[in-house]
């Protein structure tokens, strides 16, 4: 993917607008989880060090477009940035007709979703964003799959449009895993439903040497192999699809499972052979034999893509399968990339964040890239790089 990179540009004295992903949870005016801001700090610091007249914007929550709403203000993010950067940071509310910024100064432009035309990407709004800057930096991978005013339109009309370090790193890691994977390549896809991950499974079945399925998705494959899944979450209307995928791809078959009788934190866990599941059972995890077999596959891989846990890891008695998978990925010398909300929660729970080669910040954008879809904001940056 050939895009202009912010790291290659001279930003001294230039008006620079960064579209970041600062969509963080806020409670009582305080940021409660700062991961996305922390991920953006190196980009901000680099632009300030380069002497940019720096503006940054993001969405936060889902406000009614065209209306200011204090609940969705970026003010708590501004307060966080003041502390993190130990420098003054201004919040600009009305900025579409221009902002005065000094070299080495940072101004946060209020929630871009307060602007009418943001979601529809109206040309009028896109041109107003573009007029604010000499250089537009797209650094919000999590919104790259949306063609909105602050992600796509501004990149179309800004004098220069480039990828920030976060976005460039994300594209590089995904390209390494998906476009030119070192083999063998193993993909692990968990989640509750085949239907929501069908395109992902189909796309990965063409790339991966082995496709590991987990969670509710695995139940559909277990049923497709002719086993009883009891009361487990299972999409019986997709059994033929599962059979087709299993015939076309190397999908390891689950041999043992961990079952309970109801979806609750207190239901006792029982390990069973996959052929011994009864009508009253609910499958909530893979068993130890299956987990060990998958760990061996992971340890022999050269590239690993992980999207989704293999069991209900939130309940400790059904977390062993996901823990074994997580620890195998952590111990493997392979290049590994992980993405998706539940996957990140599992990485946190088992403390392996520093052992995964790359953790993707974009949920929907990550999945769309894996599905082989074009990400509009990235496509626009590529178009501008060619011009």
From Swiss-Prot:
Monomer. Coiled coil: none annotated. It holds the Pfam family PGK. Belongs to the phosphoglycerate kinase family. Its EC number is 2.7.2.3. It catalyses: (2R)-3-phosphoglycerate + ATP = (2R)-3-phospho-glyceroyl phosphate + ADP. GO terms for biological process: gluconeogenesis; glycolytic process. One of its GO terms (cellular component) is cytosol. HAMAP family: Phosphoglyc_kinase. This is Phosphoglycerate kinase. ATP binds at residues 197, 314, 340-343. One of its GO terms (molecular function) is ADP binding. Substrate binds at residues 21-23, 36, 59-62, 113, 146. Pathway: Carbohydrate degradation; glycolysis; pyruvate from D-glyceraldehyde 3-phosphate: step 2/5. It is found in: Cytoplasm. It comes from Aeromonas salmonicida (strain A449). It comes from the Bacteria. Keywords: ATP-binding, Cytoplasm, Glycolysis, Kinase, Nucleotide-binding, Transferase.
């Amino acid at each position: 993917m050939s895009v202009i990179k912010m790291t290659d540009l001279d930003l001294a004295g230039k008006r620079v607008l960064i579209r970041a992903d600062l969509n963080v949870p806020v409670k009582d005016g305080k940021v409660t989880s700062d991961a996305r801001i922390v991920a953006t700090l190196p980009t901000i610091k680099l632009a300030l060090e380069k002497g940019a007249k720096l503006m940054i914007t993001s969405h936060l929550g889902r406000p009614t477009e065209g209306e200011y709403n204090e609940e969705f203000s970026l003010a708590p993010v501004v307060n966080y940035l003041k502390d993190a950067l130990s420098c003054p940071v201004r919040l600009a509310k009305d900025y579409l007709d221009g902002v005065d910024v000094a070299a080495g100064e940072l101004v946060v432009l209020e929630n871009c979703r307060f602007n009418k035309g943001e979601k529809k990407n109206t040309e009028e709004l896109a041109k107003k964003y573009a007029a604010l800057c000499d250089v537009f930096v797209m650094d919000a991978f999590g919104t790259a799959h949306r063609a909105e005013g602050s992600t796509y339109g501004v990149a179309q009309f800004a004098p220069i449009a480039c990828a920030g370090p976060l976005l460039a790193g994300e594209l590089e890691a995904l390209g390494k895993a998906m476009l030119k994977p070192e083999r063998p390549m193993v993909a692990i896809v968990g989640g509750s439903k085949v239907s929501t991950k069908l395109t992902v499974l189909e796309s990965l079945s063409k790339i991966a040497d082995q496709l590991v399925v987990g969670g509710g998705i695995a139940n559909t494959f277990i049923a497709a192999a002719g086993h009883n899944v009891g009361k487990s979450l299972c999409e019986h209307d997709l059994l033929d699809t599962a059979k087709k995928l299993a015939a076309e791809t190397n999908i390891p078959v689950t041999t043992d499972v961990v079952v309970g009788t109801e979806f609750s934190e207190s239901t006792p866990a029982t390990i069973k052979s996959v052929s011994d599941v009864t009508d009253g059972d609910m499958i909530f995890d893979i068993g130890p034999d299956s987990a060990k077999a998958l760990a061996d596959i992971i340890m022999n891989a050269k590239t690993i893509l992980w999207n989704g846990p293999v069991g209900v890891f939130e309940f400790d008695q059904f977390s062993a399968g996901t823990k074994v998978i997580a620890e195998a990925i952590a111990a493997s010398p392979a290049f590994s990339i992980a993405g998706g909300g539940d996957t990140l929660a599992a990485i946190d729970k088992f403390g392996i964040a520093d052992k995964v080669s790359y953790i993707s910040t974009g949920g929907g954008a990550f999945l769309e890239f894996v599905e082989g879809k074009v990400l509009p904001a990235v496509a626009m940056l590529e178009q501008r790089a060619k011009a």
